[in-house]
Amino acid sequence: MAREYKIEDYRNFGIMAHIDAGKTTMTERILFYTGKNHKIGETHDGASTMDWMEQEQERGITITSAATTTFWHGRDGKKRRFNIIDTPGHVDFTIEVERSLRVLDGAIALLDANAGVEPQTETVWRQAEKYHVPRMVFVNKMDKIGADFYRSVEMVGSRLGAVALPVQLPIGAENDFVGVVDLIEMKALTWDGTIGAPATVGEIPADMADKAEEYREKLIELAVEIDEAAMEAYLEGTMPTNDELRALIRKGTIEVKFHPILCGTAFKNRGVQPLLDAVVEFLPAPTDVPAIKGIDVKTETETTRESSDEAPLSMLAFKIMNDPFVGSLTFARIYSGKLTKGVSLENTVKGKRERIGRMLQMHSNSREDIDEAFAGDIVALAGLKETTTGDTLCDPLKPVILERMEFPDPVIEIAIEPKTKADQEKMGIALNRLAAEDPSFRVKSDEESGQTIIAGMGELHLDILVDRMKREFKVEANAGAPQVAYRESITRAAEIDYTHKKQSGGSGQFARVKIIFEPHDGDDFIFESKIVGGSVPKEYIPGVQKGIESVMGAGPLAGFPMLGVKATLIDGAYHDVDSSVLAFEIASRAAFREGAQKAGAQLLEPIMKVEVVTPEDYVGDVIGDLNSRRGQISGTEARGIATVVNAMVPLANMFGYVNSLRSMSQGRAQYTMQFDHYEPVPTAVAQEIQKKFA
């Protein structure tokens, strides 16, 4: 079967926004107008098509990027194929947004007309900048009290540092919003609000004529800057035709020079069809964006893969999901070549082969089996064994590793334990499945406490994962409070001379050791023997080292593992009959316990390297707050229109920080933190910790 739609007629795009900007409603409208949905699902009914996990329907927020294929007849009457990826708008799920953006060619940024550019919009916009994704902006909820299109346009410049290019103006606002002025055609488009009704095309209202002229002039001035010939013609007094103007806007949008801005209200069905036309006219086809880069596995040199069916097959797995009916599904974007059911592909990241069994085209939560797919397609593959997010699948004869995605390290950890014995095994399986789906979620076992520790991007992130474990895997578990891993060390040298004697009929036990314990700069334990002349026979020396190592795991202050200790065996004595390896082990153990006390034991705590990216207005508050958390500020620098604050802060003082930072900066600041080093705990704090763990 040949390709049904030319690759030039594909549009792979996502809708990105702050939570509550109306993204799910907008996607629903798009699916309705493009003919895939018969009844529109409203988010506040919990009946939305794209939000298909139970938690999403309950909470009314989108957690998982669902990929949907649909079709639209553009202004020219030609049918185009849309692959839409829905993305979450909550800070804890930015990993989902990041991996969606990685496989998109373009995006629509949705703004709430009342709030304008909100914190999460800034975060997502920054991620889109990183991948150089062409974007349009749709100012939604124009019917809302306080809706202000012009303020939203201004904020795109001031908050996002982007060039705004309005291609429409609103007619009326709040309850009086009826339609838009099309600045390219210079016509008014109005809707009566009935579902699916086409726009009525008319003349621009007289009271808006001057404003429309002013904005059209600005539009043309920005658009002609993209092309030298158009610029020269314009300066000589020749205006571009409407089609030429569209072509210039398309070029500038794809080159990320500016961002077309449209407006409407998805909920009231006004402005949706012109937005779909704009997707066709301004957002790129897979062939309009640069060919994807990768590393040729055979030559280890950089290579590219063109968006063409003739090129060798290459695709990127960008998401893994557990589907209640099909099991594990791997979503992949085909960048080049043609994929046929039943072929074997190379996973070049894992070095393993994968057979493509079942291939599905997804429509939110319904699915259609397909036998082949082409460059530009987004497909769901069932039953892959080895592939995880970010892996490349390709033609085994032309192996390539496509650019990988970067995933942030988790910032919060909690201990979790199953409620019953029966839950124990199921919990292990559930956690492994969830970790395979979500690269920002990690699972590990704490060697010291034996507990299972889960780590993620925030409190909501972990809440939802524990909740999913309960619903999808029927595992009941208790989650604990976040914990800090302290350590202990010594501050000075101490020499210990210890004799172990035990006489209890028959042969006894005897061992004498003389050891110097001292601190050293590393984190590891160093053992050295300086025995000369056989005061301790060679065969007993390993017993001395083993004895010390066996008690290093629990320090004298609060039972935490010890770091940075050097032990030097300098002398000792033995008995021909009563000495043994075990006797020397016992003697060195007791010597270490005594030595750790004498050598000035101290508590150490993990210090985190913290980076906060904040708008300038909140820098003072952020620095003050970090100081109050015993933080040391190491510097600030400008990054675009934001400020970066770098600091070293004890982990114990960072719990709950994400919520404090959100409220302090109205959600506009972000932070990352990673472990840097251990440092002595201040005396007052150390006493509290010792009491707690004694």
Curated annotation (Swiss-Prot):
Main subcellular location of this protein, as a coarse class: cytoplasm
Compartment(s) where it occurs, according to its Swiss-Prot or TrEMBL record: Cytoplasm
InterPro entries per record: EFG_II, EFG_III, EFG_III/V, EFG_IV, EFG_V, EFG_V-like, EFTu-like_2, G_TR_CS
GO CC entries: cytoplasm
Gene Ontology molecular function terms on file: GTP binding; GTPase activity; guanosine tetraphosphate binding; translation elongation factor activity
Start and end residues of each tr-type G domain: 8-287
Residues annotated for GTP binding in this entry: 17-24, 86-90, 140-143
Keyword Nucleus set for record: no
Record keywords: Cytoplasm, Elongation factor, GTP-binding, Nucleotide-binding, Protein biosynthesis
Origin superkingdom: Bacteria
One BP annotation, GO: ribosome disassembly
PROSITE patterns to which the protein is assigned, alphabetical: G_TR_1, G_TR_2
Record's function text: Catalyzes the GTP-dependent ribosomal translocation step during translation elongation. During this step, the ribosome changes from the pre-translocational (PRE) to the post-translocational (POST) state as the newly formed A-site-bound peptidyl-tRNA and P-site-bound deacylated tRNA move to the P and E sites, respectively. Catalyzes the coordinated movement of the two tRNA molecules, the mRNA and conformational changes in the ribosome.
Stored HAMAP family: EF_G_EF_2_B (MF_00054_B)
Family, similarity comment: Belongs to the TRAFAC class translation factor GTPase superfamily. Classic translation factor GTPase family. EF-G/EF-2 subfamily.
Protein's UniProt name: Elongation factor G
Organism from which the protein derives: Brucella suis (strain ATCC 23445 / NCTC 10510)
